[in-house]
Amino acid sequence: MKVQSSVKKRCEHCKIIKRKGRVYVICKVNPKHNQKQG
């Protein structure tokens, strides 16, 4: 999972999720796209 200051969807399968005040991008099809805002 990459930690980035600005997270964006990288494909149509990516989902933006907020958990505990953090923003995550979760992608089941391509796990390389997983990101966390930090």
Swiss-Prot record:
GO cellular component entries: cytoplasm; ribonucleoprotein complex; ribosome
Name of the protein this chain belongs to: Large ribosomal subunit protein bL36
Pfam families per record: Ribosomal_L36 (PF00444)
InterPro entries per UniProt: Ribosomal_bL36, Ribosomal_bL36_sp
Domain of life the protein comes from: Bacteria
Signal peptide residue numbers: none
GO biological process entries: translation
Natural source organism: Thermosipho melanesiensis (strain DSM 12029 / CIP 104789 / BI429)
UniProt family annotation: Belongs to the bacterial ribosomal protein bL36 family.
Keywords: Ribonucleoprotein, Ribosomal protein
Molecular function GO terms recorded: structural constituent of ribosome
